[in-house]
């Protein structure tokens, strides 16, 4: 065995061992580690606050898909005013003829005021008010007996015309 590996190591000056030295404090020895830990904790807290705030926003706003959006067409009767009906079909109550911009003046008398606004007039009719209960006489309307080939080839559009609310896909399919 080599004897040089087993030789005791002595301090150069015996006074170094005997001098009173204070041990450094925990904060001074681990200051860098503590600062890094504080910065990491602050970053984690900021990320958690951001994640929870975005979840609350998503939960508060209902998830609306394209199929759930309904479009209400206030000019439902008026947009088809130029098209002539098919023979054998009758005009729905409250439908206009060719007077798109003119108010309907020959309505049945009701206790509700006439607004000349198609949106509110249709809402009054849809809620089952007095206007919906008393249907106008058939003498007020004249039906045209001309042949309309375009409406014969589009039964889906005709079905949409009868409804008051439309989905996004219905509108795409009708175009």
Curated annotation (Swiss-Prot):
Span list, region Disordered: 79-121
Topology of the protein relative to the lipid bilayer: Single-pass membrane protein
Keywords for this protein: Apoptosis, Host cytoplasm, Host cytoskeleton, Host endoplasmic reticulum, Host membrane, Host-virus interaction, Membrane, Microtubular outwards viral transport, Transmembrane, Transmembrane helix, Viral envelope protein, Viral release from host cell, Virion
Cell compartment(s), UniProt: Virion membrane; Host cytoplasm, Host cytoskeleton; Host endoplasmic reticulum membrane
Main localisation: virion
Residues annotated as signal peptide: none
Chain intervals for the UniProt region annotation (Interaction with host DYNLL1): 141-153
BP GO annotations: microtubule-dependent intracellular transport of viral material towards cell periphery
Protein name, per record: Inner membrane protein p54
